[in-house]
Amino acid sequence: MEKLARKQVQALTPYLSARRIGGSGDVWLNANESPFDNEYKFNFARLNRYSECQPPELINAYAAYAEVKPEQVLTSRGADEGIELLVRAFCEPNQDAILYCPPTYGMYSISAETIGVETKTVPLTSDWQLDLPAIEASLENVKVVFVCSPNNPTGNIVDRKDILSLLEMTKDRAIVVMDEAYIDFCMEKSTVDLLADYPHLAILRTLSKAFALAGLRCGFTLANEELINVLLKVIAPYPVPVPVAEIATQALSEAGLARMKYQMLDLSANRAYLQAGLMVLPGVTVYEGWGNYLLVKFTNGDAVFKAAWDHGIILRNSPIENCVRISVGNREECEKTLGFIRNQLI
């Protein structure tokens, strides 16, 4: 069966999500999920009907939250589908390329490689910012540039002046995609205000993180209407199931937004607690994080990761040497994780 698959697929290494990696324990801080399990109501009477391609209530609700026009919003099965749509819509297989800046989210390359689109990488600088000269030198045949801010796994914000420079150098050349999956934790750092000046800018959003709806798989692409209309040509006819649209709309209601903001305050306090506790440990560096996770460097990161794993505390090993990414959980989970790491190092 393997030999029947396309050559690109045969050579493909699948993205190792937290669930694929597995593990066994009672503290799960490896997927940047929210610890909050919120309840929603659902009307089961509509399940015999197909969903609308772009449910108006959901589109209007997210447009109001993001402070854009409804025609600037597209909803999809998570932000991952948004990534795939952008690559499929703007890149010719075996001709065009995407560009991204590791260390960063792994699905950009997977989405491109799956359909035979070349991937170009320009590593981030030592302080995890864009290497603009290297990016400019690599733009030949590049149709889509992906930038994650706050970046996963490093947690930092990409400098706004560098984003502006990138947008200027890619005018009439490529689409710039800002992955803002974690921007709800620092909305003042969003690039949504730049949509008015840059028609080649697209912004990815999700309800998986701050809204505590990772299992719902509901994401959004924000862009100018012309770009959104291109994506609507390639999206599936029923991308958002009826239950997803209904629950997501509830999450974006006045009451839902108030709950989300309260829970974000709780997570921010837990992040500060975890950061302060880890920083004082010997041989530990905690990088500033703007999302619901922290990147932590140890003298031997693999050893800490494995010891925690064996103890039922599931963290995320990082491709960055000796670094482990720790999602921010509830206070009990943070206390247990911090206590375990402290006992390992002292």
From Swiss-Prot:
A Pfam family this chain is assigned to: Aminotran_1_2
PANTHER family in UniProt: HISTIDINOL-PHOSPHATE AMINOTRANSFERASE (PTHR42885:SF2), HISTIDINOL-PHOSPHATE AMINOTRANSFERASE-RELATED (PTHR42885)
Enzyme class: transferase
Record's protein name: Histidinol-phosphate aminotransferase
Pathway: Amino-acid biosynthesis; L-histidine biosynthesis; L-histidine from 5-phospho-alpha-D-ribose 1-diphosphate: step 7/9
Reactions performed catalytically: L-histidinol phosphate + 2-oxoglutarate = 3-(imidazol-4-yl)-2-oxopropyl phosphate + L-glutamate
Record text on subunit structure and interactions: Homodimer.
Keywords for this protein: Amino-acid biosynthesis, Aminotransferase, Histidine biosynthesis, Pyridoxal phosphate, Transferase
Matches recorded under InterPro entries: Aminotrans_II_pyridoxalP_BS (IPR001917), Aminotransferase_I/II_large (IPR004839), HisP_aminotrans (IPR005861), PyrdxlP-dep_Trfase (IPR015424), PyrdxlP-dep_Trfase_major (IPR015421), PyrdxlP-dep_Trfase_small (IPR015422)
Co-factor(s): pyridoxal 5'-phosphate
BP terms from Gene Ontology: L-histidine biosynthetic process
MF-aspect GO terms: histidinol-phosphate transaminase activity; pyridoxal phosphate binding
The EC number(s) this enzyme carries: 2.6.1.9
Species for this entry: Aliivibrio fischeri (strain MJ11)
